[in-house]
């Protein structure tokens, strides 16, 4: 039995594995781009299949493709979407910057599978052509950016945003639950005036709420599709209604608000929509990194750190120190945030490097974008499930640190002035006294006045958490 078969493209014949659906151009790419291990993301492959499915339907409706061929292409695309042909898409991220080879990989797989569905024999009889039928009314230059936007929007809506909302809700519940716990604040890693633990966490909640708004603000641009622009944005070789109809069809089959891009030249020449959307993801990464760092600092200890909160003990933390437990969820989250920030640099460089009518950094851009979405979504889910929901206050430690803080002296500013208050704090620190003892020793106020004026619970403003 033959292990290879001959496939042809415009450059001639080439042997491909007999058991594979791909054709000549995919094989050439496999042989010419054996670079690293990163493959085209499955979600991008599925977005390409969705795009081809929608195009076949619209081409049929416009009388440009027979019902028989269109139906076979759609059935083949549905098989790809069901995961039946995942091993038919082996191409590397590091290929042509337009994604042409992955577009042709999809065209060849769908054409060969559709031909089989129509009774053809693989490698012997082509009833559906990869270019003339599957790629009808299309160019790689508008197909690949369309698939990028489809994959990106669906990932943001279905993966990232739900996890962001869940984590925000968890922290909001913690903020409300801890609204009456007065603790010492810290600025510059030094003691500061008091606030409540609920107020502190409310800041985290507000950060995430702003991140959600920024991400949602970017979605309409991502929902704009390049399909119909063909090679350079002019729409050469397309029906006048094709672009609008294919965007409408994609909106229907994905239940997402896709529209045809109002300017196809921008849609082909830039990656601006994903650059801007990823900027919002970078902002989310910055916020999550700050939150994770705060959590692990507040939970540091258990005896020699800040120790104001406890977090779940999920696994042993050391191979040499018995009983040690580390803030591993915080560490995982901060690492992935660093990766997202690195991805943002690469996406910015790729987005800025397009020339004339086409950006040719697209595979790298979408690879990094989808990785960032996946990392952030998975990271938030893990952090929420294994850390945030289990945050609990250590009230005894909180009260100890609060009562030992010299910054409670700030409450005296309006009564005896900044200079005298500072003198009290310095004397207390230098001589190891309490603030009250130092104040009384200096004779600046009476014991009754100190007890009346230095009351931490009255120094936090509204006891509400700012929600």
Swiss-Prot record:
Top-rank taxon, per record: Bacteria
Pfam families documented for this protein: FumaraseC_C (PF10415), Lyase_1 (PF00206)
GO molecular function: fumarate hydratase activity; identical protein binding
Site features described as Important for catalytic activity, chain residue numbers: 331
Temperature dependence of activity: Thermostable.
Residues that bind substrate: 98-100, 126, 129-132, 139-141, 187, 319, 324-326
Residues of the active site: 188 (proton donor/acceptor), 318
E.C. no: 4.2.1.2
GO cellular component terms given for this protein: cytoplasm
Catalytic activity: (S)-malate = fumarate + H2O
EC class: lyase
Coiled coil (residue ranges): none
Phenotype when the gene is knocked out: Cells lacking this gene show an increase of biofilm formation.
Cell location: Cytoplasm
Protein name (database record): Fumarate hydratase class II
Organism this protein belongs to: Escherichia coli (strain K12)
Native organism taxonomy: Bacteria, Pseudomonadati, Pseudomonadota, Gammaproteobacteria, Enterobacterales
Gene label: fumC
């Amino acid at each position: 039995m033959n292990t290879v078969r001959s496939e042809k493209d415009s450059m001639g014949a080439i042997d491909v594995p007999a058991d594979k659906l791909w054709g000549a151009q995919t094989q050439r790419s496999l042989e010419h781009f054996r670079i690293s291990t990163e493959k085209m993301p499955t979600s991008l492959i599925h977005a390409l299949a969705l795009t081809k499915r929608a195009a076949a339907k619209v081409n049929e409706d416009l009388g440009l493709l027979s019902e028989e061929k269109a139906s076979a292409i759609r059935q083949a695309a549905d098989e790809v979407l069901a995961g039946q042909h995942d091993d038919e898409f082996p191409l590397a991220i590091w290929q042509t910057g337009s994604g042409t080879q992955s577009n042709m990989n999809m065209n060849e797989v769908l054409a060969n599978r559709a031909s089989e569905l129509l009774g053809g024999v693989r490698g012997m009889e082509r009833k559906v052509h990869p270019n003339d039928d599957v790629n009808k009314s299309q160019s790689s230059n508008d197909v690949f950016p369309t698939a990028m936007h489809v994959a990106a929007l669906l990932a943001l809506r279905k993966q990232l945003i739900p996890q962001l909302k869940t984590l925000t809700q968890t922290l909001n519940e913690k903020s409300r639950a801890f609204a009456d716990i007065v603790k010492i604040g810290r600025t510059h890693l030094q003691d500061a005036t008091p606030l409540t633990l609920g107020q502190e966490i409310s800041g985290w909640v507000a950060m995430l709420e702003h991140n959600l708004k920024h991400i949602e603000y970017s979605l309409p641009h991502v929902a704009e599709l390049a399909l119909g622009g063909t090679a350079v944005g002019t729409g050469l070789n397309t029906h006048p209604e094709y672009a609008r109809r294919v965007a409408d069809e994609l909106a229907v089959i994905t239940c997402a608000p896709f529209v045809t891009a109002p300017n196809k030249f921008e849609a082909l020449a830039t990656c601006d929509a994903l650059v801007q959307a990823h900027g919002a993801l970078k902002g989310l990464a910055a916020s999550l990194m700050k939150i994770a760092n705060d959590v692990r600092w507040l939970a540091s200890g258990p005896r020699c750190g800040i120790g104001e909160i406890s977090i779940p003990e999920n696994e042993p933390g050391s191979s040499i120190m018995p009983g040690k437990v580390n803030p591993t969820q915080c560490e995982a989250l901060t690492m992935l945030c660093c990766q997202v920030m690195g991805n943002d640099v690469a996406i910015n460089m790729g987005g800025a490097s397009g020339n004339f009518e086409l950006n040719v950094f697209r595979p790298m851009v979408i690879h990094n974008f989808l990785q960032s979405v996946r990392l952030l979504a998975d990271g938030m889910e893990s952090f929420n499930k294994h850390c945030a929901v289990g945050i609990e206050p250590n009230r005894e430690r909180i009260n100890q640190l609060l009562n030992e803080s010299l910054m409670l002296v700030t409450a005296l500013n309006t009564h005896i002035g900044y200079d005298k208050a500072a003198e009290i704090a310095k004397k207390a620190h230098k001589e190891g006294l309490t603030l009250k003892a130092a104040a009384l020793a200096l004779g600046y106020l009476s014991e009754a006045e100190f007890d009346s004026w230095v009351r931490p619970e009255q120094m936090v403003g509204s006891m509400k958490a700012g929600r």
